[in-house]
Amino acid sequence: MAACSRTQVISLYRMLIKESKKFPSYNYRTYALRRVKDSFRENLHVDNPKTLDMLLNQARENLAVIRRQVSIGQMYTAQRTIVEETGVHRDL
């Protein structure tokens, strides 16, 4: 991987992680974070420039999808799950 491509990949990875953390729903947020990390880890050793360009374009498209879905999720919020509840702890 060339130095320029490496910086692009790292920047894109960080943007995907940052945007995935914005999901209001716990389930979508954890799923998106897991998928981003797994797909980058899976393609860590790709050296072919054509394959690398294809993967970068695919990641950019996924970033656009994540941004769109975060916006939709923020417009139509749902109740928080028990996993997301913080503050009051009951002793059983």
Swiss-Prot record:
GO terms for cellular component: L-cysteine desulfurase complex; mitochondrion. It comes from the Eukaryota. Pfam families: Complex1_LYR. Signal peptide: none annotated. It comes from Salmo salar. InterPro entries: Complex1_LYR_dom, Complex1_LYR_LYRM4, ISC_assembly_LYR. This is LYR motif-containing protein 4A. GO terms for biological process: iron-sulfur cluster assembly. Belongs to the complex I LYR family.
